[in-house]
Amino acid sequence: MKFFLDTANVEKIKEFNALGLVDGVTTNPSLIKKEGRDFYEVIKEICAIVDGPVSAEVIALDAEGMVKEARELVKLAENVVVKIPMTKEGMKAVNILSKEGIKTNVTLIFSANQALLAAKAGASYVSPFVGRLDDVGQDGMFLISEVMQVFSAYGIETEVIVASVRHPIHVIESAKMGADIATIPFDVLDKLFNHPLTDNGIEKFLADWEAHMNR
């Protein structure tokens, strides 16, 4: 399973990339706004750090505008993937861009039907949002199982990016279901390292070693 970092924070990307854990990065307008920097500068800097795909989202809502933005975004770096919203206009743009060889990541997916439509339109990636479904009383992980089942049944090559990840359970459940990628906020990725028994074990080893050396 591949891990993408869901952030526009360059320092955090550098930190986790140095550990060999970052296969790609996803951004969105909200994450860029949080950093308070120029959109294009941030994307270029991230692309220079990470070898894998870096998703940058369009702002236009019409297909013509999305395509125009996408063509500009891919000029920034070879690893830019254009993030497109799941709408009719978005799918029109995805269809055009896929024929031009421009990779796309269809975002804001909340049903298996939407994921299937995006794949048929030519999306390189689809991003089902699990946390937001959980927030409204639905089972976000059930959506992932549905999408994986449909894609597997038809040999669909579009990769599934589990998005809106809120906690480590989302990550491991996605891995168990065979999802291609989880895009993870850095605070959640930090939590994957931790287990109280690991901490206890380290403390015991150190205490035993100190006792041995002081005999």
UniProtKB/Swiss-Prot annotation:
> Which Enzyme Commission number(s) are listed?
2.2.1.2
Q: Which domain of life is it from?
A: Archaea
Q: Entry's SUPFAM superfamilies?
A: Aldolase
Enumerate the GO terms in the molecular function aspect.
Answer: aldehyde-lyase activity; transaldolase activity
Q: In which pathway does it act?
A: Carbohydrate degradation; pentose phosphate pathway; D-glyceraldehyde 3-phosphate and beta-D-fructose 6-phosphate from D-ribose 5-phosphate and D-xylulose 5-phosphate (non-oxidative stage): step 2/3
Q: Which biological process annotations from GO are given for this protein?
A: carbohydrate metabolic process; pentose-phosphate shunt
Q: Name one Pfam family in it.
A: TAL_FSA
Give the matching InterPro entries.
Aldolase_TIM (IPR013785), TAL/FSA (IPR001585), Transaldolase_3B (IPR022999), Transaldolase_3B/F6P_aldolase (IPR004731), Transaldolase_AS (IPR018225), TSA/FSA_arc/bac (IPR033919)
Kind of enzyme, top EC level?
transferase
Q: Which UniProt keywords apply?
A: Cytoplasm, Pentose shunt, Schiff base, Transferase
Subcellular location per UniProt equals: Cytoplasm
Stated family: Belongs to the transaldolase family. Type 3B subfamily.
- Name of the featured protein: Probable transaldolase
Q: Which organism is it from?
A: Methanococcus maripaludis (strain C7 / ATCC BAA-1331)
